[in-house]
């Protein structure tokens, strides 16, 4: 997806229904917001969190969109906007004592990465 904002071209990539808590993903997203593409790749590769893998896929997808569709060089890209939104809850039941059922909610999240080029 493309956005024109103050004559700057912004390239967007979305990751939907990621089976992870938005709170845990935000912890990693806050570390890469505003950084260059290469620096974000290095951080996401070596951080010890499970949330890094889906974020890395979305960041790589946004960079591939920018380079393939608009001819941007990956060395000039930076993450101008990164956000995590709450997705739908998967509701499950866990069997408990005496025939009861205990509700369990499995959260999901949406990851949005916006990349622009420094010129």
Curated annotation (Swiss-Prot):
A Pfam family that the UniProt record links to this protein: Ribosomal_L22
Keywords: Chloroplast, Plastid, Ribonucleoprotein, Ribosomal protein, RNA-binding, rRNA-binding
Gene Ontology terms describing biological process: translation
InterPro entries: Ribosomal_uL22, Ribosomal_uL22_bac/chlpt-type, Ribosomal_uL22_bac/org-type, Ribosomal_uL22_sf
Recorded GO MF terms: rRNA binding; structural constituent of ribosome
GO cellular component: chloroplast; large ribosomal subunit
Location in or out of the cell: Plastid, Chloroplast
Protein family according to the UniProt entry: Belongs to the universal ribosomal protein uL22 family.
Reported function: This protein binds specifically to 23S rRNA. The globular domain of the protein is located near the polypeptide exit tunnel on the outside of the subunit, while an extended beta-hairpin is found that lines the wall of the exit tunnel in the center of the 70S ribosome.
NCBIfam families linked: rplV_bact (TIGR01044)
Subunit (UniProt): Part of the 50S ribosomal subunit.
Designated name of the protein: Large ribosomal subunit protein uL22c
Source organism per UniProt: Spirogyra maxima (Green alga)
């Amino acid at each position: 997806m493309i956005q024109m904002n103050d004559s700057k071209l912004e390239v967007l990539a979305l990751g939907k229904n990621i089976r992870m808590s938005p709170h845990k993903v935000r912890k990693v997203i806050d570390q890469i917001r505003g950084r260059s593409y290469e620096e974000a790749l290095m951080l996401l590769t070596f951080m010890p969190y499970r949330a890094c893998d889906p974020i890395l896929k979305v960041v790589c997808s946004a960079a591939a969109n920018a380079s393939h569709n608009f001819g941007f060089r990956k060395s000039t890209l930076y993450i101008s906007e990164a956000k995590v939104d709450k997705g739908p809850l998967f509701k499950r039941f866990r069997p408990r004592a005496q025939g009861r059922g205990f509700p369990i909610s499995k959260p999901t999240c949406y990851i949005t990465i916006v990349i622009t080029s420094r010129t």
